[in-house]
Amino acid sequence: MSDAQQVPAIVILGQGALDTARRVQARYPGALVHGLAGRVEADRSYTDFGDTLRELYCADRPIVALCAAGIVIRSLAPLLQRKGAEPPVLALAEDGSAVVPLLGGLAGVNRLAREIGEVLAVAPAITTSGELRFGTCVLNPPAGYVLADLEQGKRFVADLLGGQPVRVEGAAGWLDAARLPRDPAAALAIHVTPSARAPRAEELLIHPRCVLAALE
């Protein structure tokens, strides 16, 4: 996802959501507020809410929709059967009283929800099991790193949630504060390495992006 794509699109339906939208917008330089034509004066106007959300979703843009979660889900439902990566999508109450991550757990939606929650002084409604238990999403490493195999990573997290301990090999400072069940003799391992190889069984392999690009 490029820097431009990382900036969320803030979508509102009416004037009542504009103040909250502007507060969120101030947190993300370059973000635009999209408002329904004829109802609210925003940075950009649209005429069909569902079409707008689907266009943003297909363009891999993070979406912050100030409306009921059900409206967002129904609008994006035709696209959700497709396999592949999805951008962060969250619903936000018009008055800023609730922040609900909906889609994009592996694309940083919970991080986005926490950032917006800080702006609005509310706790986001995070439901991701791994993140609630460990305090982080191990399948969403920070910028500059990439998973070697997402599908194996999902199985790895299932084993962690099942109670298996883990050891960490390599420089993974972002995991220092994570509540992982660490054991230096564990069979499961999170391994951060520039070595371009296939992950071994019981291993979550993470590569630095810059080194991976050089090897390619």
What spans do the regions from the language model cover?
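SAM-dependent methyltransferases
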Residues: 1-63, 68, 75-88, 92-216
